[in-house]
Amino acid sequence: MSSTEGKVICCRAAVAWEAGKPLVIEEVEVAPPQANVVRVKILYTSLCHTDVYFWEAKGQNPLFPRIYGHEAGGIVESVGEGVTDLKAGDHVLPVFTGECKECDHCKSEESNMCDLLRINTDRGVMLNDGKSRFSIKGKPIYHFVGTSTFSVYTVTHVGCLAKINPQSPLDKVCILSCGISTGLGATLNVRKPKKGSTVAVFGLGAVGLAAAEGARMAGASRIIGVDLNSNRFEEAKKFGITEFVNPKDHKKPVQEVIAELTNGGVDRSIECTGNIQAMIPAFECVHDGWGVAVLVGVPHKDAVFTTHPMNFLNERTLKGTFFGNYKPRTDIPSVVEKYMNKELEVDKFITHQLPFSQINKAFDYMLKGEGIRCIITMEE
């Protein structure tokens, strides 16, 4: 039993007091875990674009003060009543969505959209009692997607924790708890390109590069990267991108450009921007008869997807995916093992490292479009 079990822990956390304002390192109180909840010591966290999006208050009813962060790795400090498959000392990755293992979605081999623990960006409290476990001098600080990893200690539902190989380096595999797995799984689990196939990836941010990495692992012969920023092509080559298309360089629609490059269209495509102007060509550029397009990017709430019905009747398939169709507790440990077995290259996604005290610099990198992933070390 740890010396802190059952007690309130005081630790540092990066608190967002207002939308778009720099985070402030504060001393916060973290309450002990209740039933089916685990308290985790976060060792490394990363910044995902989703954190920035909601910090800017673009995607929800503004909820502040709040502790963001959802891409991280840590060690279990203590567990609440009813937690049987985790114990103090276990290495875990917190995940923004969960797996209760009891609902119809969790019991289905075809879904990872847990009824109980599916992502909820508006909820800033725990499920048990509708209250926060973070506070400063008695004033509650809100949670974010059930993880809040910008705190040295956090509490999360047991269903949102993937128990992983204790030999795996947390400062590397922490990035597998969100964006990288989303792109990787969209390719390997949903799009499933055959060896020697042609693939197009729309959007070469972290998720798109992970999708390209998945296509490389699957043995695709041509991986065409599509992005409005030509400066991304050189970096993208490290992830298997063999050709690059910038829609701004062509007078005709990009789906026509790709069709001409590939004798009628690619076998598989994946859209990772959330922009309708990319989603439509990502679907229309796949080959008739067998082409499959997968949508990963989250569109604007008022966006409308339009395409001619003949695109479907000509046997093109359009699919959507959530978190790469991975079940957090069941599947993410095996993704970590792909890294440990040298099947998956993770290190090349990590372009910056910072101490926790400089977390705002990570936001600057993201806002300027510099790098892919920045690892933040919680202990200095």
UniProtKB/Swiss-Prot annotation:
Cofactor(s), names only, from the UniProt record: Zn(2+)
Subunit structure: Homodimer.
GO MF term (any one): zinc ion binding
Principal EC category: oxidoreductase
Keyword Cell division: no
Protein name: Alcohol dehydrogenase
Binding of Zn(2+) 2, residues: 100, 103, 106, 114
PANTHER family: ALCOHOL DEHYDROGENASE, ALCOHOL DEHYDROGENASE 2
Keywords from the UniProt entry: Cytoplasm, Metal-binding, NAD, Oxidoreductase, Zinc
Places the protein is found: Cytoplasm
UniProt keyword Zinc present: yes
Residues annotated as binding an alcohol: 50, 70
Binding annotation for NAD(+): 50, 203-208, 227, 232, 273, 296-298, 323, 373
Cofactor note: Binds 2 Zn(2+) ions per subunit.
Catalytic activity: a primary alcohol + NAD(+) = an aldehyde + NADH + H(+); a secondary alcohol + NAD(+) = a ketone + NADH + H(+)
Pfam families according to UniProt: ADH_N (PF08240), ADH_zinc_N (PF00107)
